[in-house]
From Swiss-Prot:
Its main location: membrane. It comes from Bos taurus. This is Transmembrane protein 180. It is a multi-pass membrane protein. Pfam families: MFS_2 (PF13347). PANTHER family: TRANSMEMBRANE PROTEIN 180 (PTHR28658:SF3). GO terms for cellular component: plasma membrane.
Length: 517
């Protein structure tokens, strides 16, 4: 009876809460990983410089390829539009398969996270293996989690409801960044290891528990009429035929890529999202540099650390306000408004100049918060593209994970372009090469190796001016490009309603076919 009470309470949680909690179990690990993995291998394990760059290069290639690879392996059976013979799968069975995958891959993600903080191999080899293992399991978790957003719900209202809880739990998970400051000590690493062990244990158990709850909810939805157990999708009540096997009706990777090349809205979206990913990582890479050269004389070190920490939490809290707006006005209108806001704030900052510390501080923080927040909203747009892809190509089932993987394949180069283009622009404008001096290190991180001393003070004014123009002109250029590409995107308004209606009618038609057979 003692166990029955809490378990009964957990079973009574809404599906959206259980789904959103998965974002918590990822966020508590990933934010700590981003903040400390370089410092750990450089300052604690003393990794060799050549081994560090070899590991980062291999990681860059693996990080770019694993999204479409795992998406293809997961969803290739869903691509055929031709009827085939074989064992049937229902829409509910697809969701159950994704939930089971999360139940396995989530704990493995937690184990791969733990592998960073205990030396168990030569530093270079451990660095390479840990990065590839961690990113592989993180990709699997992200793909199936995002795919569930498209599979559990069809209407925009229900999807924003699910995304609302993802933002709420992601904000809670970001608090692990603040807690980590109390345990981080390069001289005595044992307390930080214990902290990471506690995070990994909680995350792994959370994945197992959440996957079990979701599985019971989906299974109950198939047994009970009207789907009372599922709060967000009536479609899971239906037994939609999805046949397996590798018969002649299957689609090859080349044919799928041709279909994507004809998917006009997909092409415009990934063009816009490439710029968005670039801008997000540009802000992350140069946030400490802007604080150092534009605000170091006006704010304390603790204030700068607080701004850095709050920038991890604020985008998720910000989305709690924007998601209700998405329900009312649509994601397209809200994203367009955010692009206009980015352009307007950047133009105002350009006109004001670099001599207003308060305004600069507000702009640097808001620029990062709004940009990161926009990235979170774009997940909803990808789910709409999943619907349109299913309708345009008459698929038997939505290839959700595969489409998310293809979006990541096209947009991830923005992560690489951000630091390269930013440092090149700064060097071109000011003659200042960041690699020729010790750049300011973010809180909780460190640059791998000491560099020669900074240039003489006479170069400081041009560098400060260069940082300011980089800060305001990059958002202006990004906003203009995004407003143009977003204006070409037509999956909103009447067209979006038509796609939703056609997907619902396809689902009902498939259900009738199965019942007639």
């Amino acid at each position: 009876m003692r166990l029955g009470g809490p378990w009964a309470w957990l079973l009574g949680l809404p599906t959206a809460v259980v789904y959103g909690s998965l974002a918590l179990f990822v966020s508590v690990l990933h934010n700590v990983f981003l903040l400390y993995y370089v410092d750990t291998f450089v300052s604690v394990y003393k990794i060799d410089k050549a081994a560090f760059w070899v590991g980062e290069t291999v990681f860059l290639l693996w990080n770019s390829l694993n999204d479409p690879l795992f998406g293809w392996l997961s969803d290739r059976q869903f691509l055929s539009s031709q009827p085939r013979s074989g064992a049937g799968l229902s829409s509910r069975a697809v969701v159950l398969a994704r939930v089971r995958a999360l139940g396995w891959h989530g704990p493995l993600l937690a184990l791969s996270f733990l592998a960073f903080w205990v030396p168990w191999a030569p530093a270079g080899l451990q660095f390479l293996l840990c990065l590839c293992l961690y990113d592989g399991f993180l990709t699997l978790v992200d793909l199936h989690h995002h795919a569930l957003l498209a599979d559990l719900a069809l209407s925009a209202h229900d999807r924003t409801h699910l995304n609302f809880y993802c933002s709420l739990f992601s904000a809670a998970g970001s608090l692990s960044v603040f807690a980590s400051y109390a345990f981080w000590n390069k001289e005595d690493f044992s307390s930080f290891r214990a902290f990471c062990l506690a995070l990994a244990t909680g995350s792994g158990l959370g994945f197992v528990g959440a996957a079990r709850l979701l599985r019971r909810r989906v299974e109950a939805a198939g047994r009970e009429p009207g789907c009372p157990a599922m709060a967000v999708n009536d479609g899971l009540c239906e037994e939609e035929l999805l046949v397996g096997g590798e018969e002649a009706g299957s689609i090859t990777l080349g044919q799928y890529l041709q279909q994507l090349a004809r998917h006009r809205n997909f092409l415009w979206f990934v063009g816009m999202d490439l710029v968005q990913v670039f801008h997000c990582h540009f802000n992350s890479n140069f946030f400490p540099l802007f604080l150092e050269h534009l605000l170091s004389d006006h704010i304390s070190l603790s204030t700068g650390s607080f701004l850095l920490g709050i920038s991890y939490v604020a985008p998720h809290l910000n989305n709690l306000y924007f998601l209700p707006l998405c329900r009312r006005w649509g994601v397209y209108a809200v994203v367009r408004g955010l692009f206009l806001l980015k352009l307007g704030l950047s133009l105002l900052m350009l006109l004001a100049g670099p001599d207003h510390p308060g305004l600069l501080c507000l702009f640097i923080a808001s620029n990062r918060v709004f940009t990161e927040g926009t990235c979170k909203l774009l997940t909803l747009v990808v789910t709409d593209l999943v619907d349109e892809d299913l309708v345009l190509n008459h698929r038997k089932q939505a290839a959700s994970a595969l489409l998310f993987g293809m979006v990541a394949l096209v947009t991830k180069p923005g992560q690489t372009f951000a630091p390269l283009l930013g440092t090149w622009l700064l060097c071109f404008y000011t003659g200042h090469d960041l690699f020729q001096q010790h750049p300011p290190a973010p809180v909780g991180s460190a640059q791998p190796w000491p560099e020669p001393p900074a240039p003489p003070p006479a170069q400081a004014p041009p560098l400060r001016q260069g940082c300011f123009y980089l800060l305001v002109l990059v958002p202006i250029a990004c906003a203009l490009l995004q407003l143009f590409t977003w204006s070409q995107f037509t999956l909103h308004g009447r067209r979006l309603h038509m796609v939703k209606a056609q997907r619902q009618s396809l689902s009902r038609a498939q259900t009738l076919d199965v019942k007639m057979v």
